[in-house]
From Swiss-Prot:
Similarity-based family: Belongs to the UPF0134 family.
Top-rank taxon, per record: Bacteria
Taxonomic source organism: Mycoplasma pneumoniae (strain ATCC 29342 / M129 / Subtype 1) (Mycoplasmoides pneumoniae)
InterPro entries (alphabetical): DUF16 (IPR002862)
Protein name: UPF0134 protein MPN_130
Length: 140
């Protein structure tokens, strides 16, 4: 957890100014005890900004440019996913139509088979009747 800490005493402030050689600073610095990084919050004059010491900075923050690049790449990735899903949806729709056509064709074939079976049954019945008549004729 970050905590705001003022310079503890004047000596600490002067040590900071000595490190920068020139400049003044008025404000707070924020210490992150997890990774010992320091962030400044306050007013710096121009010389202090130019000569400030190298201090490890918390890397959790990103610049606007980095964020926009990430957002753009993420948007592009989402667009690719959307187009892929749209193409797959179209394929599924086409396959559904093909399945419906096959079902209609299957129904027509089953009706044709029923008609063929009925015709064969009628022919079988006729043959049976003819056999009975032939038997009667032969028996006379």
């Amino acid at each position: 957890m970050k905590e705001k800490t003022p310079f503890k005493n004047e000596k600490e402030f002067h040590d900071m100014v000595k490190k920068t050689k020139k400049g003044t600073f008025s404000g707070w610095y924020i210490v992150n005890p997890e990774n010992n990084s320091v962030e400044f919050s306050g007013n710096f004059n121009r010389q202090f900004k130019l000569n400030k010491p190298v201090i490890p900075v918390n890397t959790e923050y990103v610049t606007r440019k980095e964020f926009n690049e990430y957002k753009d790449s993420n948007d592009q990735r989402l667009i690719k996913i959307e187009t892929t899903l749209a193409a797959q949806g179209e394929q599924i729709r086409i396959q559904g139509e093909q399945i419906k056509e096959l079902q209609i064709e299957q129904k027509a074939q089953s009706e044709t088979l029923k008609l063929i079976l009925q015709t064969l049954q009628k022919m079988s019945d006729r043959l049976d009747k003819m056999d009975v008549r032939l038997d009667k004729l032969e028996s006379k």
